[in-house]
Amino acid sequence: MNIPDYWIKMIKEKKDEDWHPSSIWWETTNRRADEKTISYAESHDQALVGDKTIIFRLIDADMYWHMQKDDHNFMVERGIALHKMIRLVTATTINGGYLNFMGNEFGHPEWIDFPREGNDWSYKYARRQWDLVDNMDLKYHFLGDFDEAMIKLIRSVRNFQATPLLKVWDNDG
């Protein structure tokens, strides 16, 4: 199983309290040390029509109604926190590089659907709403700011991708 499939399986099949650190560690580091890999939390096909992104699986329809900065909704707060954790764990256990698909870094709420016969060649969803992350009244900028800080942290360590991964401790309770 690859990392994006693992995160989807966790979200769909496990309660938060059943997310075991040892399992997360294994899935995000299970590779040959001498082979460079590109790690990513979600794949491009999860954002295509017919599937859901990680953030949408975590927040679902509350994303359309509760993303105002001053709206305190449990599902949204939980989803944002888990989204950040998933991305941080994935990005910091790389063995070569980290990849993000456009818009996923700030939790874009819609799928991508390129013009095709099945949608009457529409361009309606062949876009990303970049204004969402720039709107300081919405929570999307929290995710965008986190992603920016995370990448800055990783870049601050010279040759980060070559840093040996060391499991210090886990407790599956």
Language-model features: where?
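Aromatic- and carboxylate-lined catalytic core of secreted/periplasmic carbohydrate-active enzymes
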Residues: 128-167
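Short, helix-capping/interhelical loops that line the mouth of catalytic, cofactor-
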Residues: 119-131
